[in-house]
């Protein structure tokens, strides 16, 4: 006999109704989240491509310069969602097998001669007949995965009602990154990308013209690459006595790879095992 949650107040095991990633009902992941949040500030288990940070700085700057409703969060998110979807499409089309691209599963299933970014990304389209939206969270990939990260890295300010600021804005550091990102994208590609986002559609054949937006390729020697490196090696916070846990963690990983380059098959397991053994020796 089925019961409802209103009828039973004690904890009970129930059938899992649907598959969904990210759920942690017993808070088993809490300790891990606390540890990596402290050890690698600005990096999480879902921020798999650091170039997303530069992309978001650039697209928010472009949106602000290009639309008439400057202080509208709804408009800002409308175009940032379309931009995320377009980025997923161009990655799937041009760089098969590259991981860490949010929305890529949707993009792979919905490639067509004429691609509607509007129907695939706009929140208003979720009730219309069709393949659905590329991302269920209203603020998109940015809101779910990267908004906290770019704030921790001092790149993007969050909306603040106290100062009548309804949108995400760039810090000076974010503006610098947006400019550096833009320098690595030819003007014709930037224009095509934005016009496609603004109009809500693009031809599949035009995706090949947007390869400079590749998330896995950051030109060597570029100021964009330098900003990422400095951000990762900088202090974790602005306290009087700042911590450098992220920098020290990166050093440990690089040292481990340098020492065990040929034998490392699973970096995470190998790295944790080696450091655990090292800690045991120190304790003894």
Language model feature labels by segment:
Residues 1-284:
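Non-catalytic recognition/regulatory regions in large multidomain proteins
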């Amino acid at each position: 006999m089925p019961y409802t949650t209103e009828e039973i107040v004690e904890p009970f095991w129930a059938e899992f109704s649907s598959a969904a990633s990210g759920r942690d009902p017993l808070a088993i992941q809490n300790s891990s989240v606390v540890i990596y949040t402290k050890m690698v500030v600005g990096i999480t288990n879902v921020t798999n491509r650091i170039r997303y940070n530069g992309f978001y700085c650039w697209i928010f700057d472009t949106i602000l310069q290009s639309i008439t409703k400057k202080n509208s969060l709804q408009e800002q998110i409308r175009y940032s969602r379309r931009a995320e979807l377009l980025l997923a499409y161009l990655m799937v089309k041009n760089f098969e097998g590259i991981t860490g691209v949010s929305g890529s599963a949707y993009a792979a299933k919905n490639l067509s001669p004429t691609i509607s970014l509007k129907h695939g990304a706009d929140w208003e389209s979720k009730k219309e007949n069709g393949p659905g939206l590329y991302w269920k969270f209203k603020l998109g990939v940015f809101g779910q995965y990267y908004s906290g990260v770019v704030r921790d890295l001092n790149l993007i300010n969050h909306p603040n009602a106290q100062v009548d600021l309804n949108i995400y804005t760039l810090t000076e550091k974010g503006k610098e990154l947006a400019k550096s990102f833009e320098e690595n994208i030819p003007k014709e590609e930037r224009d095509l990308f934005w016009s496609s986002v603004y109009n809500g559609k693009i031809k599949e054949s035009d995706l090949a013209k947007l390869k400079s937006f590749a998330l896995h390729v950051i030109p060597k020697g570029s100021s964009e690459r330098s900003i990422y490196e400095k951000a990762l090696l900088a202090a974790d916070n602005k306290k009087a006595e700042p911590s450098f846990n992220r920098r020290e963690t990166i050093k440990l990983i690089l040292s481990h790879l340098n020492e065990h380059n040929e034998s490392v098959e699973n970096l995470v397991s190998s790295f944790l095992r080696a450091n655990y053994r090292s800690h045991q020796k120190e304790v003894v």
